[in-house]
């Protein structure tokens, strides 16, 4: 008994992928150049999240449903422009992640105002402020004031104080005080409690990422993508031939840049999850490419008389159904996440969808066709070597 199958991609297709490679390469160059230009900070830049830019992330739970837009407006009205508010966890929990790009309320002007106010009342030996910490000013006195008097002086400068902590002075005969100012958590928590009193907001978790740590995370993330690409090139070279590696590295670079374009052009937040997307796209892209390369290797042994261009075109057509259906099935699951996903999950799904489309395209038009281009260049270079030596032949003949 034979079963009838429904083929989305019919057998025996004869699309000329190799013949269209020049158009595809020009199109890819334009798209990649546009993404890279738009991602330059001086032109537009990526919207780095708290993970990479540094800042404060708060998880807040409400007892009743609250609109994310209303929370965002409330936070931005406090002076935190560009605040990100996303739903977190199950919808029934009414939990949100609030991200702001600052780890402290105090800037340079605030610190100067506080120091001037304290110095106007007490003889300060020295003071220090670490912007990486952002909410603590250290004062050292020979004749220390009482903690209450110091707190009153700081609050008189318009800065709320959470704690004044006495510490041992650095020099003999001195006394230090660490003034801990009210931070972002207290300000946002107080504001939410005022505007959403009936919803009973509860701060579950607060995380701070300093700018230096954010830069380090960002650099390490991009390094991880580059290391993954390098290992993939080595794998392809060992499994097939290192002649195939340039095509692979160009294809996965193409896919990573196109996926990056989703974050660059939409302005969506680029964070550690985005790095995970790039790594996933790179791995997914090379999977399709390996399928085509396997078929090329088989067909090279099978069709000795055919040129590499003919074998590549034949191999892509023979694996067309498999590569298309694999990508199509994955895309269907991502569409479901796009419909029901929010926040980070939505961005992950959307960027993955862009990467899968790009990966399928690069498998057909970039990876294998670029291998042909490198082979043709190598053949021309090899052919030009005897030609360069040809003028010496007549001289040898004359000597005979």
Regions found by a protein language model. Name each.
Residues 1-400:
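A structural signal for conserved, well-ordered secondary-structure elements
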């Amino acid at each position: 008994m034979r079963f009838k199958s429904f083929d989305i991609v019919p057998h025996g297709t004869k699309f000329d992928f190799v013949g269209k490679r020049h158009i595809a390469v020009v199109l890819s160059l334009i798209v990649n150049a546009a993404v890279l230009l738009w991602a330059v900070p001086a032109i537009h830049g990526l919207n780095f999240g708290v993970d990479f830019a540094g800042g404060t992330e708060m998880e807040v739970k409400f007892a009743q449903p609250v609109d994310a837009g209303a929370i965002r407006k409330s936070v931005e009205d406090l002076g935190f422009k560009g605040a990100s508010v996303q739903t977190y966890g199950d919808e029934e929990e009414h939990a949100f992640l609030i991200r702001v790009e600052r780890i402290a309320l105090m800037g340079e002007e605030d610190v100067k105002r506080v120091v001037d106010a304290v110095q106007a009342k007490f003889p300060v030996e020295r003071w220090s402020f670490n912007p990486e910490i952002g909410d603590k000013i250290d004062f050292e006195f020979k004749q220390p004031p009482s903690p209450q008097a110091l707190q009153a002086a700081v609050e008189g400068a318009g800065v709320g104080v959470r704690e004044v902590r006495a510490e041992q002075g650095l020099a003999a005969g001195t006394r230090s005080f660490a003034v801990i100012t009210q931070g972002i958590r207290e300000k946002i928590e107080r504001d939410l409690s005022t505007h959403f009193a009936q919803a009973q907001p509860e701060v579950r978790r607060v995380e701070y990422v300093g700018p230096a740590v954010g830069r380090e995370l960002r650099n390490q993330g991009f390094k991880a993508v580059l290391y993954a690409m390098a290992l993939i090139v080595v794998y392809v070279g060992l499994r097939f031939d290192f002649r195939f590696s340039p095509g692979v590295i160009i294809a996965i670079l193409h896919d990573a840049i196109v996926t990056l374009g989703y974050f660059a052009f939409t302005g969506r937040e680029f964070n550690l999850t985005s790095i995970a997307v790039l790594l996933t796209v790179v791995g997914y892209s090379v999977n399709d490419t390996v399928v085509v390369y396997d078929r090329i290797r088989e067909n090279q042994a099978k069709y000795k008389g055919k040129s590499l261009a003919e074998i590549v075109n034949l191999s892509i057509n023979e694996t067309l159904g498999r590569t298309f259906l694999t990508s199509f099935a994955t895309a269907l699951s991502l569409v479901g996440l796009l419909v029901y996903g929010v926040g980070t999950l939505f961005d992950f799904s959307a960027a993955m969808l862009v990467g899968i489309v790009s990966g399928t395209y690069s498998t057909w038009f970039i990876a294998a066709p670029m291998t042909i281009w490198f082979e043709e260049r190598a053949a021309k270079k090899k052919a030009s070597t005897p030609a360069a030596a040809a003028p010496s032949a007549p001289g040898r003949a004359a000597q005979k």
